[in-house]
């Protein structure tokens, strides 16, 4: 008679969860950050709000963003004037867009990841799909399964309304799935579109305007599995540990509410301070088992919520400027793409490391950290191990 313990042992993988491929995608349309205030105030019929436009111009100029990709074009916005108002009923129009576009953009990223992986998609056993853009049943996970032609028996998990920390969450979940299911290959997709949050400016709610200056569209996909097949699968990073915490005294610091007017976004001014004040505690807990306490000795992938967060974290931890290079590059080229950002940064880092002939995928370093920050205020801390290039 076989025991439960023997069954469990046979079910488990031997080695750690490993990232085997990364793919990214954006809509074709993009906006130039320097001229975006002109576009934004024109399409929202707000050009008479001269002082507010000047404030928004300063926000965009100080954002450290050069361009952002957006599904929303001037033509789409002209057809949907309620989306351009500050608070007008518009959820139906927004939903009609995102339920189609979110899986579609996710498919582009997933297709690229599968191509890099080089294995038949029939080997994908699990799908984790994450978006903060819209809600539907069956979900974007179901739609993507159909679009990609995955097996109907693929085990799906749909994550809606998590926000900007979720790029860390999906890795934490995929790690547990891969390590507890021998032979599992988990396709993780984060797909985000600002069609749910776009709205006109308000003199009284400047935090909403901050979101309009920062958010962009993008999708990223990774394939994760344990015990990579030698000579067949190429490991990029190993996921060593993953943790989540709610920061103290941070209630209401970042909120999002799905309403008739779309997804409203609320942000308190002290978010960068809350994160920078508490981040070292998460680092100490994550790296104590590895006997690491020099934060410049590891590689960094941090969700670029905005330039102030990165600046304050850098200052608080006395990080060398190059530590956040990949993070700042993604912020500059894409803006804040919510959950997808950290996966874009991971992709940028491994490509740069290879191009520069560095010893590992993590900028030549062995150990690294991936941080997700978002509503709660919630922090995801993922310890990564760079792989030899």
UniProtKB/Swiss-Prot annotation:
Pathway: Secondary metabolite biosynthesis; flavonoid biosynthesis
InterPro entries assigned: Chalcone/stilbene_synt_C (IPR012328), Chalcone/stilbene_synt_N (IPR001099), Chalcone/stilbene_synthase_AS (IPR018088), Polyketide_synthase_type-III (IPR011141), Thiolase-like (IPR016039)
Any Pfam family: Chal_sti_synt_C
GO molecular function, one term: naringenin-chalcone synthase activity
Gene3D superfamilies registered for this protein in UniProt: 3.40.47.10
One annotated GO biological process: flavonoid biosynthetic process
EC top class named in words: transferase
Protein name per UniProt: Chalcone synthase
Native source species: Hydrangea macrophylla (Bigleaf hydrangea)
